[in-house]
């Protein structure tokens, strides 16, 4: 659509062109129209739809850029929009921004308080190495879930935060509840938690159980050898003392 004698075509004319391009599945031309609408009539619907079309074209850089612009203008007020933006940040390897967006959405009661969204916030903070922010989100995610997987993931976060007793308790709860994708990995976390608590016998049992799965057999054996060497080291230290 062309501007004539410096006059701006009416918004509905652009929308008619947009509709016709969509009807023909000419999405490149539809994007051109949407980008023009964004310049002259910067409404939420145009920002969001253009972002969606860039997503369809696998251009996540422009998709995220438009979502960011819409977010900064306060246009994104739906749970699905904020969740989408958080995932885009994660895909762009920007977990801190993902955590910030979803956390604010939850705090402002714009994002639905369901397990999956708390998990998204917790995972984003964990990836950003913000363990203290991740823990309460993962706690809420696990509490709202019927399966044990999220309790195991919570155990991982507790372990990262040096909360070893809570890590062991959470992993045990997850294994008991069931639905854990990799029980062997969960038992490795359990073993590491017990090791850091100085409960070597429990740690050894956990690693042996983990090693029953060939995918964790190597790490299990390494940990068991390490426990044995640590026990021997402590015995030698006691000898030196007395």
Regions found by a protein language model. Give the residues of each.
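Alpha-solenoid helical repeat scaffolds
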Residues: 1-197, 202-234, 240-242
């Amino acid at each position: 659509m062309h501007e004539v004698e410096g006059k701006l075509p009416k918004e509905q004319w652009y929308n008619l062109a947009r509709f016709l391009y969509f009807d023909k599945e000419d999405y490149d031309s539809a994007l051109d129209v949407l980008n023009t609408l964004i310049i002259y009539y910067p409404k939420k619907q145009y920002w969001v739809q253009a972002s969606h079309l860039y997503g369809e074209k696998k251009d996540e850089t422009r998709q995220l850029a438009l979502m960011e612009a819409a977010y900064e203008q306060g246009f994104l007020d739906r749970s699905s929009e904020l969740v989408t933006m958080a995932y885009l940040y994660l895909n762009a390897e920007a977990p801190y921004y993902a955590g910030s967006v979803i956390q604010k959405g939850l705090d402002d009661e714009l994002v639905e308080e369901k397990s999956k969204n708390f998990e998204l916030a917790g995972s984003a903070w964990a990836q950003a190495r913000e363990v203290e922010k991740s823990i309460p989100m993962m706690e809420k995610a696990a509490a709202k879930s019927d399966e044990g997987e999220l309790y195991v993931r919570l155990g991982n976060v507790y372990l990262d935060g040096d909360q070893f007793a809570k890590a062991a308790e959470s992993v045990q709860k997850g294994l008991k509840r069931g639905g854990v994708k990799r029980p062997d990995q969960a038992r490795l976390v359990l073993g590491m938690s017990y090791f850091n608590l100085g409960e070597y016998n429990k740690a050894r049992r956990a690693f042996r159980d983990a090693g029953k799965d060939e995918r964790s057999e190597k790490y299990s054996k390494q940990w068991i050898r390490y426990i044995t060497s640590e026990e021997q080291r402590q015995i030698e230290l006691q000898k030196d003392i007395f």
